[in-house]
Design a protein with these regions (language model features):
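Glycine-rich helix-loop-beta junction characteristic of Rossmann-like nucleotide cofactor-binding loops
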Residues: 74-82, 144-145
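Generic hydrophobic alpha-helical segments
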Residues: 69, 73-77, 97, 101
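Class I SAM-dependent methyltransferase SAM/SAH-binding core
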Residues: 86-88, 94-143
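N-terminal auxiliary segments of SAM/dcSAM-dependent transferases
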Residues: 1-47
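Short, glycine- and charge-enriched coil/turn segments that flank and shape catalytic ligand pockets
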Residues: 16-17, 78-85, 106-109
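Class I SAM-dependent methyltransferase Rossmann-like catalytic core
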Residues: 51-72
């Protein structure tokens, strides 16, 4: 995991219990689905798409209508990212493309460190359920919690 603390920008390390902590003591629990909520916001409420919107998008994408596009994007991503390289999916939504990239890379015997970010907690939750191999976080693409 290459995540950094959204408060102090220190490196996050994961404890045996799954909590991500920075050197200054800020901590972030891993959700049961396997993602972290690293969104700092003074505004309460829902950010990004709500559960109903995300579920509707997943239902449509799972029909396969966009699978040829997803496969081609995944092939290009795997082809142009070096083995062991880092790939960021900013605005990963419910994980359709992120998961496809991961699967195409695995089928090509290529290891990619894939991080997905979305401002929608509902979307990231579904992405984490779709693919437990991904490193996912609720975060804003305007302030990505990732090390340079």
């Amino acid at each position: 995991m290459n995540f950094i603390c959204p408060k102090c920008k220190g490196a996050l390390t994961v404890t045996d219990g799954g909590t991500a902590k920075c050197p200054l003591g800020h901590s972030y629990d891993r959700a049961k689905e396997g993602y972290y909520n690293l969104l700092l916001s003074s505004v309460g409420g829902t950010h990004g798409d709500n559960r109903e919107m995300v579920m509707a998008r997943r239902a449509f994408l799972d029909t396969g209508a966009y699978m040829p596009l997803a496969r081609r994007v995944a092939e290009l991503a795997a082809e142009h990212t070096p083995d062991g390289g880092l790939l960021l999916d900013c605005g990963c939504g419910e994980g359709f493309y992120t998961h496809t990239i991961n699967e195409i890379a695995k089928n090509a015997n290529k290891t990619l460190h894939i991080h997905g970010f979305d401002i929608s907690k509902a979307a990231v939750r579904l992405a984490a359920k779709r693919d437990r191999d991904l490193s996912l976080a609720v975060a804003s693409s305007y302030d990505l919690p990732i090390a340079d």
